Amino acid sequence: MRWFLVLLLVALVSVEASRRSRLFKKLYQKASNYDAAPSNVQTVWYKNMKLDHFTWGDTRTFDMRVMWNNTFYKPGGPIFFYTGNEGGLESFVTATGMMFDLAPMFNASIIFAEHRFYGQTQPFGNQSYASLANVGYLTSEQALADYAELLTELKRDNNQFKMTFPAATQVISFGGSYGGMLSAWFRQKYPHIVKGAWAGSAPLIYMNGGGVDPGAFDHITSRTYIDNGCNRFILANAWNATLNLSSTDAGRQWLNNNTVFKLDPRTKIRNQTDGWNLNAYLREAIEYMAMVDYPYPTGFLEPLPAWPVTVACGYMNANGTSFSDKDLVKAVANAANIYYNYNRDPNFTYCIDFSICGDQGTGGLGGDELGWPWQECSEIIMAMCASGGSNDVFWNECGKDIYQTLQQGCVSIFKSMGWTPKNWNIDAVKTLYGYDLSGSSNLILTQGHLDPWSGGGYKVDQNNAARGIYVLEIPGSAHHLDLRQPNTCDPNTVTNARFQIIQILKCWVDPNCNTIPTISPLPSISIPNGDCKDVVGGYPWGQTTGATVSNSFILAILASLYAMF
């Protein structure tokens, strides 16, 4: 769910522009060879996918990329279907190891479908983002219809793939971040096609009317750092320190020639506006490390050590409040270097003007970098901002009307296409999918306690649980860690959550399972020590159903005793 992630496409020429650009937090993650989960996928193409599923007057089509692995599939087994999100499929294949780990147990086929307008699935080729008329077909609703058509085709005799799944084949959808949102909505919109959904770190209610505080993301980011030993004063005051230094000749001289970081020659500090640019650059690293605070080395966004927030706090944990401006900036910059330059490349430079260099924090996204901003400027409109003070360690950027500020950002990005506020629907998600789960069933919604995006997810509700809607907030877990390949360094909470989820999946695909599974509270967190290694085919990872039942039994006894007194 990226996150999160910030895609800063507008030059930060003022404080207000900085606020606008930071509103586009992109959930996409870029994988690397650090995240090489076992996959062995084959690429195939769905030919002649409908461009517009909701009219009979438009017969245009495009080709959609699909990756699959049928090594473990046996007739009668389910389809594990990944609802592709805002990026190329490769990232999601390598970062969703649980699907591959479970497939042999379930005799499952693994299918990843690429989201229209992302990766290699470009309906209009290199003109996909050339006009509003073209990019207007980039919607979650159209993408879900793509997935529904693909699965329908796969169950059709003599289909274009020359591989037919029985009509009774159960489909379980998987997804993380925006992909998790799609996975949950897929089950809600197409329950006749999808038996159930595992949606990891999906901010399903972070839109208008969902009841989420706009400051939730940065509140949780700040909590993750403070809980890991960071001195709140250092983080909260470093931003003004940057501005103070950028306001004087001596301060600018130091910022441009210090020994902690090198600035790109094109983006030297010349004024306080450049100081804001530096703040945005440093903050991006702080936020992203909270998202990907994994217990082992990864390369999900950039190459990072295990528990990167803990490592970062090693530079920001000095006691007290008596720090010079230079001390504060050095502390946060050293922390940011863990994200941007963990491999200590001596030639690495901070390019802090995103209009010149793009976003170094999520570089390599390809030619579809306008995709997520378009979706945030049309249907998936998330009001997010830091407010400082007691809420978080950043500056107050909320302003009087967060949506008006967001609109100004949309105009800046899409003005050449003629974007106006008429092109967005602030209530699109509420109208298309809704926030009330009373009519839904068979949803597994996981949230990582460390993950800033968890603030946009559902909370535990016993009424929902009675309908087979499971909400798990997992201590010690960052952005959809539960969907990644199991690892010896995973906290026991993550392992137990996976184990319980698998019992639910078993019921969903078993035609003889007529009882809604229940889940138990997760155990107190314990973090393993030692070498971190992927665990392939390790289910049940030392967990037992009996232990889970026993925990529930103990809780029931305690509740009864409490009632007696």
UniProtKB/Swiss-Prot annotation:
The keyword Magnesium does not apply. It comes from Caenorhabditis elegans. GO terms for biological process: proteolysis. Residues 1-17 form the signal peptide. This is Putative serine protease pcp-1. Gene3D superfamilies: alpha/beta hydrolase, Serine carboxypeptidase S28, SKS domain. InterPro entries: AB_hydrolase_fold, Peptidase_S28, Ser_carbopepase_S28_SKS. GO terms for molecular function: dipeptidyl-peptidase activity; serine-type exopeptidase activity.
